[in-house]
Amino acid sequence: MIDTTIFQDKTAVYYTLGCKLNFSETSTIGKTLKEAGIRTARKGEKADICVINTCSVTEVADKKCRQAIHRLVKQHPGAYVVVTGCYAQLKPDQVANIEGVDVVLGAEQKGELMNYLGNLEKHPQGEAITTAAKDIRSFSPSCSRGDRTRYFLKVQDGCDYFCSYCTIPFARGRSRNGRIEEIVEQARQAAAEGGKEIVITGVNIGDFGKTTGESFFDLVKALDQVAGIERYRISSIEPNLLTDEIIEYVSRSRAFMPHFHIPLQSGSDDVLKLMRRRYDTALFASKIRKIREIMPNAFIGVDVIVGTRGETEEYFEDAYHFIEGLDVTQLHVFTYSERPGTQALKIEYVESPEEKHRRSQRLLVLSDEKTKAFYTSHIGKEAWVLMEKSKAGTPMHGFTDNYIRVEMDHDDQLDNQLIRVRMGGFNEEGTALKGVLV
């Protein structure tokens, strides 16, 4: 049993890098510490505890993590510093050797962070406590409110896919999940707190159910029945796991929005094989067609990686033309970053940084064209928009069911409200459509 009396009136600062899943987990850690009497430090206040939740998706992410640790150690002298997350799991000794770090916790230990605070006495040398990826078994449920109106609900963790370029299975372990009844209860709690929108998050959420004998489709149907939650968004789902059954259900669902985020990674079948992805372009195209047939106005976001090992100019051109022909809304373009220990390093063909940048820019231009065309097609139409809080005197923003960003004049009473809006032209920045109350 932890003696929490030593934590009374202590303060903590939290810093999160990376994905929405990390933000959800940090929020849960914060709630646990709050229950023990530790409050979040105010802006500019020196904290007693620093919790840093890291990312390691790219080499740049690793660098940002190190910079964040150094910065927080400097800003909060004498604070007890805990580092967790993917970078901590993959390179624990490297993190432990950073001056000022006290404890490094791996994926298995993250959910029990309270147990590693001790009496908050600084360590002369950072201590790394991790579990090998193959032995990571725990699943820590979390549901957090983002900076705006959305809650992020963690339903699954880990991945069994072992794509050639990716370290996530080594950072988060094998695929595992919570039980539907537990997850539904968290959604009910979000509704009780006034939440109206939930984003379903995980590492490979379509793989949900592997550890409980349930299915992602079962989860979707159960969540759709939670009173008070007006909107659900599926954060990202593998194309081979996005079944017609799920697509059809979303099209007639009470609360699941016509909004999909589907990782393509490459539009070249040759590159997909090198990546060890579990689908080809024909399957991906069939999923897009299926969505468009029954939800013509759906927002479809697509992840693409450029410059992977083995991606020749010919393969990239194949990929570009395939993506150009897809009826999708937006591309999330990532430049390939070599990760230690991945199978991709065995592929000999390597592109220059300059060529990677050129390819990235071409796809970003294509993405802008597709997004602008999608927004333009909705000018003059009416839609329900969930508004988000903004600073006084600044425009307010919100999103339609199909994820079009709408800008409105400031009105505090609109915060977290669903309002009927007619969409006009673009705002000055070209990032949203101007809305007028109907």
Predicted regions and their residues:
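Proteins enriched for Cys/Gly/acidic motifs involved in redox and nucleic-acid/cofactor modification
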Residues: M1-T201, G206-D207, K221, E245, ...
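Conserved SAM/AdoMet-binding glycine-rich loop
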Residues: V81-V82, L90-K91, A192-E314
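Short flexible coil/turn linkers enriched for glycine and charged/polar residues
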Residues: G146-T149, C159-D160, F256, S266, ...
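Hydrophobic, well-ordered secondary-structure elements that form the walls
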Residues: I262, D303, I323, L331, ...
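Contiguous mid-protein beta-loop-alpha structural module that forms a pocket-lining wall or clamp
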Residues: E311, L326-V328
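Short, acidic/polar
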Residues: Y315-Y320
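Short glycine-rich, low-complexity segments
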Residues: T329, T342-K346
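Terminal RNA-binding accessory module
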Residues: K346-V438
